Amino acid sequence: PDFRLNKAFDRWETLSQTEKDKVEFLCNECCWFGCMDRKACYETVSRKNLGENKEHHCAAPDSDQGYRFSKAMNNPGFISVNDIQNVYMPMGFSNFKIEGRGLGSALVLEFLLYYMTKPEYQLHVREEIYLDNMLDLF
């Protein structure tokens, strides 16, 4: 999925429901919106996941900071819980992908809390996980 198309509503409105059922939106992409090297980066990540030793050095602004969920939330392509519930689902879309399985359990927890836990329960879930030592922070 190309997250830069997330907000291309004029394109999405023309799809049939069968086509909409095949669309998957990448919600929390942190990649620089103006990146022209995304294909090479994505391929490198895929090859690393396969055990290959390929390297790709991102030249995007602030790439040295790594992934930050707060940064992703400011990305023009970011899809919030509110967007999912009030924009995309009423349009007939139901497939949403959360990036970052390999970023570490603390970040994955934040994604799951944000996207899958009601705000009033987020602190309770976070405390239970921290107090139970289930989270590998390092």
Annotate each PLM feature.
Residues 1-138:
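Active-site pocket-lining/capping segments in soluble small-molecule metabolic enzymes
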